UniProtKB/Swiss-Prot annotation, chains A, B:
Function field: Specifically catalyzes the N1-methylation of pseudouridine at position 54 (Psi54) in tRNAs.
Family per record: Belongs to the methyltransferase superfamily. TrmY family.
Entry keyword annotation includes S-adenosyl-L-methionine: yes
Catalysed transformations (reactions): pseudouridine(54) in tRNA + S-adenosyl-L-methionine = N(1)-methylpseudouridine(54) in tRNA + S-adenosyl-L-homocysteine + H(+)
Lineage of producing organism: Archaea, Methanobacteriati, Methanobacteriota, Stenosarchaea group, Methanomicrobia
Protein's GO biological process: tRNA methylation
Binding-site positions, S-adenosyl-L-methionine: L128, G150, C183
EC nos: 2.1.1.257
Pfam families: Methyltrn_RNA_2
GO cellular component: cytoplasm
Protein name (Swiss-Prot/TrEMBL): tRNA (pseudouridine(54)-N(1))-methyltransferase
Enzyme category, top tier: transferase
Length: 211, 211
């Protein structure tokens, strides 16, 4: 399983935004939409072994978590508006601390970074930062990872502190600073290559076959 | 310089589509929009050393080429709707075989794959196909490349014939078939790493500094 967390510092936490203006009205929700698409799509299908966790910290109710589960996901197309629409539907739900299913494979609840980190106890955490250790030296060791990425604002000092306390390792994907969705594509590629080398089938094909 | 060609087999060739429905009304223009964004954006700025060539083959006037020049580009944001809007503006121009500037850094003309290939004479062409040679064995040799990618329909037999006749080398970016925009991110990363190893500054920073 690959879990990917993206922190949206300004991303709206109510569904009253316009799908025609995801960058403006929805607090740079376009960034999160592109991350969802990069995390989940293969050329002909979905990555079944991936969960995406969007941590939304914008107004009016900072601290909501939307989870996309590749294994159960439906109604998602690769365009930004499609993931934006599923996010909007999830934000129209009345949420509590407990998971509520919005659409197939999409879940929403209240929570913050600590909530998420607690749910990953025992997993290996990797926090993406441009000066981190190059993933190319590590990719053969990485199993069952959780990756944590910031948005256009990066990761705050407070968040970084929480990540390091939780044992996250700092990694990078190349020599220059890239958008989060591009980083996700690069992470997947490293792991796909490592899985293929081990004779496994990348992208969770086995899971799909067993559905 | 890195030139990237994406063939949009169904992409509309008039500007009368809705930015609210890039996949449907504009003939999977969403794919081309994501490619533009992946090709041109760095975390804090634009890749100045990249040109993107969209070959639009959909109705009503199949055979238009829109070129985005990283060095001169303005008004582009990373969201799909932003590149969709610049494409739409270009398609609203009356075009001929000669380049017409639509907005800063965006040019449009009539043409087909052969027109494009002729304009790259002397350059090294790389055609992306999932069973191609792995770029990781080649990346240190690649200078001044032109990459050619298909859309959701891939590349037709006829196009492939033209590409091979023009001397294109078939390469791949990993063990599984990916969306074109993800392939572009992976191509850039390989070249960025090779440039960094050679002590160059990836992303065309030198060009930017000299503007």
């Amino acid at each position: 399983m690959r879990d990917i967390v993206i922190i949206g510092h300004k991303a709206k936490t109510s569904g009253d935004f316009s799908l025609n203006d995801l960058p403006g009205s929805a607090g740079r929700m376009d960034i999160l939409c592109r991350c969802v698409s990069s995390a989940l799509f293969l050329s002909f299908g979905m990555r079944r072994d991936v969960n995406v966790h969007l941590l939304l910290l914008g107004e009016p109710e900072p601290g909501k978590i939307i989870r996309f589960e590749g294994l159960h996901l439906r109604y998602l197309n690769p365009d930004e508006r499609s993931s934006g629409s599923l996010i909007q539907k999830a934000l129209q739900k009345t949420v509590t601390e407990k998971d509520i299913r919005s659409t197939p494979g999409v879940w929403v609840r209240n929570g913050d970074l600590n909530t998420l980190l607690a749910s990953f106890e025992g997993r290996t955490l990797f926090y993406l930062r441009e000066d981190g250790e190059d993933i190319r030296g590590l990719d053969r060791e990485i199993r069952d990872p959780v990756f944590i990425l910031g948005d256009h604002m990066g990761v705050t000092e407070e968040e970084e502190k929480q990540l390091l306390e939780a044992g996250a390792k700092i990694i990078s994907v190349g020599p220059i600073s890239l958008h989060s969705n591009h980083c996700i594509t690069l992470l997947h590629n490293e792991l796909d290559r490592a899985e293929a080398e081990r004779g496994e089938i990348p992208g969770g094909e086995k899971l799909r076959a067993g559905e």
